[in-house]
Amino acid sequence: MKKRKIGNLTVSEIGMGCMGFSHGYGKVPETSYSIAAIRAAHDYGCAFFDTAETYGREQFYRGHNEEIVGRAVEGFRKDIVLATKLHISTEEYDPEGDIYNVLLRHLTASMRRLRTDYVDLYYLHRFNEAIPIEKIAESMGRLIREGKIRGWGLSQVDVSILSKAHEITPVTAVQNLYSMVERDCEKEIFPYCIEHHIGVVPFSPLASGLL
């Protein structure tokens, strides 16, 4: 499979989004099937796998999807780019505290479930207006310097937030909704990312099965 660069990361041209192994697209498959599917994708050349801490089996518990992915890729972890995402609730944010500790707590839990000691690409799953993006970006930079993550990204974000974040710590990738029937990214996100050398990782490129 062809390779592409996302910042300092080399990824396969096609990545595997793993959310459907936990929820979102009909009946949740058996774990054994999910693991086999992920490993088969790797056998065919896929070296870019995407998950999130919030992907849970029918919302039973946080981290279900990360656990599946961690088990599946353990044997070839060093050969792939592994992306996951965190969600920070308003209740977790203390304006007088250090948001870094919140990020580190989430990341540590994700790494445990993923059976790894680093994450290649760590996204903020959704921007929370109650939490300044500048503080998130600064903390992501610290995680990069400490070697806990190799790059960071934003998911479903607009240019105003992306630009503020990128000024603090260069953003590796943006993961926004994009397909032949959902093309808003072409207006502002794509031009900004091209100008600033930020990778774009579309989610739902087949419009959740419509295409």
Task: Map each language-model feature to its residues.
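Feature marks short, surface-exposed loop/turn motifs that line or immediately flank catalytic pockets
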Residues: 20-23, 55, 88-90, 125-128, ...
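Beta/alpha (TIM)-barrel catalytic core signal, keyed to glycine-rich beta->alpha loops juxtaposed to Asp/Glu
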Residues: 127-211
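Conserved residues at the C-terminal ends of beta-strands
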Residues: 17, 52, 122-125, 155, ...
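Conserved, mostly hydrophobic/aromatic
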Residues: 6, 16, 34, 41, ...
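Alpha-helical scaffolding within the catalytic cores
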Residues: 1-4, 67-70, 106-107, 160, ...
